[in-house]
């Protein structure tokens, strides 16, 4: 399970070049993933955007990794993204470009006999909840869109980094992780923001056989801040109102097939209004057709305690001109009370390239 421990570290740092790190005792690497997307959807013509049905977006993620020695590593991930890029941006106004520090942490790794390992990280990192955050990079995500629970704007699991500490451990076929951070994944707070409260998250998994792993995760802690849209007058102190999430996940790979799935339940507590709950889930499959082409699909749903739910169906054909580039052709069908006819459907093309900009190694 030594390989799995390294995967835990790389996933938390959004795939920051573990293979390179294994080749040398110390050194520095800067890896980059750049993507561009062009979606077409009638959602883009609705208020408040009121724009053309066709638009474009770009995204770049820089992954610096400084390996100090065989046990200590400093890793980071910095993202520059234009708006709109993902479907959740379609309901926002105007255009813009924003930079975000997603990851910056110091890690320590140890291995022992009998497939045991521990990775300790301190700094800014992604939430330990869920499974999709390991595939946030467009080169790792076979689809163009993202599952409904994940995102930037009031989603129960943020893509943005949280500040704290995490321990990942493996023992044989078991793996586990525990995390304590400065804010909830349901409402990420910067270390410079008010209303920061400690939050716990963790998860565990078991590899039934090679290629098949099942797991679960959870988080708990205060999430509201006094400027939150749903923090109404007369509400209780934010630190007494927790958000909680529980989830199950599965990953399977066999031959030319890969599949992923998650089921999640979230609850946000209030005093002046009823508690809000959300159920969501998705199933995703990818079939490699030949060395250059693959087909992928994702089916997802959302159900809420207040308001109607929705479901989505995304289909993608992917083409790899070479090992460093990927072109995706996708179509998404979104159904729900907020969509009329084909209004929520999205046709999109995404181009992705990944390369190693700097690599300095020292034995």
Where are these regions (language model features)?
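Sec/Tat signal peptide C-region and signal peptidase I cleavage site
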Residues: 15-21
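Detector for outer-membrane/organellar transmembrane beta-barrel domains
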Residues: 24-27, 171-176, 195, 205-305
């Amino acid at each position: 399970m030594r390989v799995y421990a390294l995967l835990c570290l790389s996933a938390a740092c959004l795939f920051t070049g573990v293979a390179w790190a294994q080749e040398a005792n110390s050194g520095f690497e800067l890896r980059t993933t750049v993507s561009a997307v062009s979606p077409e959807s009638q959602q883009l013509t609705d208020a408040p955007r009121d724009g053309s049905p066709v638009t474009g977006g770009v995204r770049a993620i820089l992954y610096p990794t400084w390996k100090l020695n065989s046990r200590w590593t400093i890793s980071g991930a910095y993202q520059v993204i234009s708006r709109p890029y993902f479907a959740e941006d379609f309901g926002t106004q105007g255009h813009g470009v924003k930079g975000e520090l997603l990851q910056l942490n110091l890690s320590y790794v140890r291995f022992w006999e009998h497939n045991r390992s521990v990775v300790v990280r301190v700094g800014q990192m992604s939430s330990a909840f869920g499974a999709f955050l390991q595939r946030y990079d467009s080169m790792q995500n076979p689809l163009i869109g993202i599952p409904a629970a994940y995102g930037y704007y009031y989603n129960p699991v943020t893509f943005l980094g949280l500040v704290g500490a995490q321990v990942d451990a493996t023992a044989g076929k078991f793996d586990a992780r525990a995390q304590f951070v400065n804010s909830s994944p349901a409402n990420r707070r910067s270390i410079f923001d008010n209303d920061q409260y400690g939050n716990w998250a963790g998860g565990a998994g078991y590899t039934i056989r090679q290629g098949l792993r099942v797991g679960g995760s959870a988080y708990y802690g205060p999430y509201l801040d006094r400027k939150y849209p749903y923090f109404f007058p007369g509400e209780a102190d934010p630190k007494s109102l927790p958000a909680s999430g529980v989830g199950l996940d599965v990953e399977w790979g066999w031959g030319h097939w890969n599949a992923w799935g998650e089921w999640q339940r979230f609850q946000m507590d209030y005093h002046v209004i009823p508690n809000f709950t959300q159920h969501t889930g998705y199933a995703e499959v990818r079939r490699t057709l030949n060395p250059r082409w693959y087909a992928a699909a994702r089916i997802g749903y959302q159900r809420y305690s207040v308001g109607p739910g929705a479901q989505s169906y995304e289909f993608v054909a992917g083409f790899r001109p070479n090992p460093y580039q990927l072109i995706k052709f996708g179509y998404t069908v979104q159904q729900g009370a907020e969509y009329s006819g084909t209004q929520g459907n999205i046709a999109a093309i995404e181009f992705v390239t990944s390369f190693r900009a700097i690599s300095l190694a020292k034995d």
